[in-house]
């Protein structure tokens, strides 16, 4: 932060000296405050647009600690099998399907409000096509997480309205619009890959102005979103995924998308406050596989074991939970992961499994695992990929209250069909392998893990022991979405009621209805039983 301040002090001094040297102009120029940067000077430095660009980047994976906690640690993280709460005074929480009114607003209203001020400032305040492309891309990166969490959301009407209390779009309409915006951004970025990095570097905490890398991220995001539609709109999913792959996705860890903030504030959440510990689910899988990445990602508990907290329990002692369950490894200089090469390669593997070559799918699957090992600095990927004996471990609660048998018997090595009769079953098991390994590789992206769990049914997760939903959630299937904030009922009720009707109309293969956590969103339609 001090470096940035010094840089701007130099800029301001230069501009002030420039103003003093040019004081022979008209009266306005003579009387201008020479220590103040003008609009023209800020435009020349890309300052006004650049600061809004930084603001949008800070929301893709929220860097503000409270916003991060509500979006990832308290909702997406638990539902994705990554994180469980240790606080013994939280009796109303997402994990037990009874979040308080205050909790419900954070992943929805707070994200939307924070996004649209800088977004509109760019699209309405500049004619720079690259800046507008960045704004469109980042809005999609932020808002696809919101629609994936809720279903129908306000989207198309927000750009032209001052109020955030507007009509909702169906999730299908949101995805359609987002693909249009991604395609527009990809086309513009593709024409500007030789733009000097200096044009954006001071405002870019991800790729430091490298447009070619941003293009890979945009195509990777398109691939993620395309595969999200694999069950609800298979033809669209296949076409959009093919376009993304052809356009060039992230294939090397050097191109991973991660936000380098001045400080990673999740250290407060996990290290200082101790409000959360690693979830039992991910450590059951990794313990069972004797996964070498485990010690690179997590800390052992007070007796040297890697063991997670069961998600959705009634915690009786925070201090005991903090010591008995493993924490994640995070430091103040840890970047906020957005998208890594392993995820893009696993998505490509699934594309090949569904619509291409099974042999290519196998190659990509193994390549993705190796990329993840490389990213974590772990060795032993080759041995890991051929060990057909190890399976996910049962859960043994160090406090003795919530132990459970393993939910899956999936092994790591790719499986080849031995005859035509078992092709479909083998393909499904290989899909489970892809999703489980991707789940391990993208930690701690909780919202994404939860979305893929809902889409595919994998990884198979432990049910919550404490269900306070009043029957509005099928505990075996887990939470399918988040409920809308109370403020929407109070300030935007007519539009909200229409959205709830749309939510129900879009649902397929669901067994709950209405604005509850058990209702399925549009793309969550796989008819599976856990």
List where the protein language model places each region:
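Short capping/connector residues at structural and topological boundaries
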Residues: 35, 42, 158-160, 255, ...
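Short coil/turn segments at secondary-structure boundaries
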Residues: 68-72, 298-300, 446-455
């Amino acid at each position: 932060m001090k470096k940035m301040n010094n840089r701007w002090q130099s800029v301001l001094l230069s501009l002030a000296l420039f103003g003093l040297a040019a004081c022979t102009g008209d009266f306005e120029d003579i009387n201008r405050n020479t220590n103040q940067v003008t609009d023209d000077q800020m435009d020349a430095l890309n300052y006004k647009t650049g600061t809004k660009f930084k603001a949008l980047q800070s929301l893709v994976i929220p860097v503000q600690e409270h916003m991060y906690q509500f979006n990832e640690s308290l909702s997406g993280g638990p539902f994705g099998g990554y994180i469980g709460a240790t606080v013994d005074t939280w009796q109303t929480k997402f994990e037990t399907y009874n979040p308080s009114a205050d909790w419900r607003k954070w992943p929805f209203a707070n994200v939307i409000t924070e996004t649209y001020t800088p977004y509109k400032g760019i699209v309405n305040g500049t004619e720079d096509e690259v800046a507008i492309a960045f704004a469109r891309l980042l809005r999609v990166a932020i808002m696809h997480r919101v629609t994936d969490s809720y279903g129908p959301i306000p989207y198309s009407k927000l750009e032209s309205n001052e109020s955030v209390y507007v009509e909702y779009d169906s999730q299908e309409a949101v995805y359609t619009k987002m693909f249009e915006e991604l395609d527009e951004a990809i086309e513009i970025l593709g024409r500007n890959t030789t733009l000097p990095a200096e044009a954006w570097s001071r405002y870019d905490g991800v790729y430091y102005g490298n447009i070619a890398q941003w293009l890979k991220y945009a195509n990777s995001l398109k691939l993620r979103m395309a595969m999200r539609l694999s069950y609800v709109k298979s033809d669209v999913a296949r076409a959009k995924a093919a376009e993304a792959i052809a356009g060039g996705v992230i294939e090397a860890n050097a191109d991973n998308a991660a936000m380098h903030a001045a400080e990673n504030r999740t250290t407060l959440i996990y290290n200082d406050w101790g409000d959360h510990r690693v979830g039992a689910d991910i450590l059951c899988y990794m313990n069972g596989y004797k996964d070498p990445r485990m010690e690179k990602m997590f800390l052992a508990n007070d007796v040297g074991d890697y063991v997670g907290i069961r998600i959705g329990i009634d915690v009786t002692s925070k201090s005991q939970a903090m010591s008995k369950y493993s924490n994640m490894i995070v430091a103040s200089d840890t970047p906020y992961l957005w998208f890594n090469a392993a995820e893009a390669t696993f998505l490509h593997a699934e594309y090949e499994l569904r619509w291409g070559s099974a042999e290519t799918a196998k190659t990509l699957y193994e390549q993705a695992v190796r990329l993840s090992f490389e990213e974590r600095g772990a060795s032993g990927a080759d041995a890991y990929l051929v060990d057909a004996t190890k399976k996910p471990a049962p859960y043994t609660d160090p406090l003795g209250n919530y132990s459970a048998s393993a939910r899956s018997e999936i092994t790591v090595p790719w499986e080849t069909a031995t005859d035509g009769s078992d092709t479909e079953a083998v393909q499904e098991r290989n899909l489970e392998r892809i999703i489980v390994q991707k789940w391990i590789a993208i930690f701690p992206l909780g919202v994404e893990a939860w979305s893929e769990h809902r889409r595919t049914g994998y990884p198979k997760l432990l049910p919550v022991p404490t269900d306070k939903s009043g029957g509005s959630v099928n505990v075996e299937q887990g939470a399918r979405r988040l409920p809308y904030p109370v403020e929407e009922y109070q300030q935007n009720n007519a539009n909200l009621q229409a959205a709830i009707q749309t939510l129900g109309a879009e649902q397929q293969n669901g067994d709950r209805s209405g604005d509850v956590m058990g209702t399925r969103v549009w793309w969550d339609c796989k008819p599976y039983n856990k």
